[in-house]
Structures are given as C-alpha cells and as structure tokens.
C-alpha cells in the first residue's frame, strides 16, 4: 500500500485523509512513530497563513521528501509552502478568492499537467487570501484564475505539484456538481509513487 505522510492534524484534515484513502493510498500522520521513514509521498494540506518563512520542522519535512525524489502534493497553504521552500514569494493578502461561508467556485485556465488532469477550463473552488507572487526556483504555473492568480504549480524536474484550490472538497464523497471532478489530482499523485 502506498503510504502518504499527511503533514497535518487528523481532527482538522480528515477530508484530505479521506480523499487519499478513497484514491487507494494509506495515510500516516506526523505524530506516528517512525512514520516518516516508511512514507512514499508527502501531502501538505491547507491551513493558516505563511509569514515570510516556513516553520523549521515543515521545511525539514519538505527537504526530506524532495531530496529523496519522492512525490509531494501541496494543497492551498501547502502549495504556498512549496513555493516558499523553493525560494518564491507570496502575496500576503488578495481579495476575491474567499467568501464568508463555504467555498467560492470560479473558472480557471489550465495548461500542461493541470489541463491533462482537469481539462483546459476547469471550474474550481477557492477559499484563500494568500497567493503565489514570484515563483520559486524550478517551479512553473500551470493554472490561473481569471484575475491571474496562480492556481496550480509544478516543478520542472521533480515530482512536486501544488494546487491553490481544494480538490479534497470537490472529489469522491464531496464531489460538487458546480465544479470539476478533482479525483484525478489524487489518482495522479498516487500514480507517481513507486512502492
């Protein structure tokens, strides 16, 4: 079974765990003893704001997976964390990508991997106020909102990918009728893993 380190908390990130399990993977939480050594991939979930630097422990976890050439998927804050780890910067506050309750659904333009998985114009959900400003070294944008906000990034030579939106909230049991089926994000992530 493909083991994914979900770098979060079980009580806060259950939707991510459910998506990984439904796609065929097993979830390992950071507090599990010896879990890090046995994992085949890393999922960085959404969460709070990033202020200039990543917490040291998070940066070390990312380094461990990147240096071993293992797949890494960042979602929302996780994508922002990857961008910062690779030396990129963030817009600290943008408007138009959050609403008081629930996700905001909007169109996007996709190329490359994002288009291959989701089509060229996928409807996606948003709930964030930080975003990529300058891309990190080796990263390229492959999806954008209508206002130019980067919605997905890939690394040119490493199995590293991030999405600003929330595929865990528009796939499998949480599939939405008003947005693209995001299950391919998780299937692709698990397909990149060699046991």
Regions found by a protein language model. Name each.
Residues 1-77, 83-91, 95-123, 129, ...:
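N-terminal beta1-alpha1 cap of cysteine-dependent amidohydrolase-like domains
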């Amino acid at each position: 079974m493909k083991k994914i380190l979900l770098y979060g908390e079980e009580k806060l990130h259950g939707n991510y765990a459910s998506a990984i399990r439904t796609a065929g993977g097993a979830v390992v939480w950071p507090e599990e003893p010896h879990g890090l050594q046995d994992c085949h991939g890393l999922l960085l979930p959404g969460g709070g704001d990033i202020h200039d630097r990543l917490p040291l422990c998070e940066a070390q976890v990312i380094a461990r997976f990147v240096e071993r050439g293992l797949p890494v998927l960042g979602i929302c804050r996780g994508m922002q964390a990857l961008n910062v780890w690779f030396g990129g910067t963030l817009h600290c506050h943008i408007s138009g990508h959050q609403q008081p309750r629930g996700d905001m659904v909007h169109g996007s333009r996709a190329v490359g991997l994002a288009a291959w998985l989701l089509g060229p114009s996928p409807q996606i959900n948003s709930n964030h106020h930080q975003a990529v400003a300058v891309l990190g070294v080796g990263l390229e944008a492959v999806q954008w909102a209508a206002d130019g906000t980067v919605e997905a990034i890939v690394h040119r030579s490493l199995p590293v990918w991030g999405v600003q939106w929330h595929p865990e909230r528009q796939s499998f049991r949480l599939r939405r009728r008003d947005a693209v089926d995001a299950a391919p994000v998780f299937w692709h992530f698990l397909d990149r893993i060699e046991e």
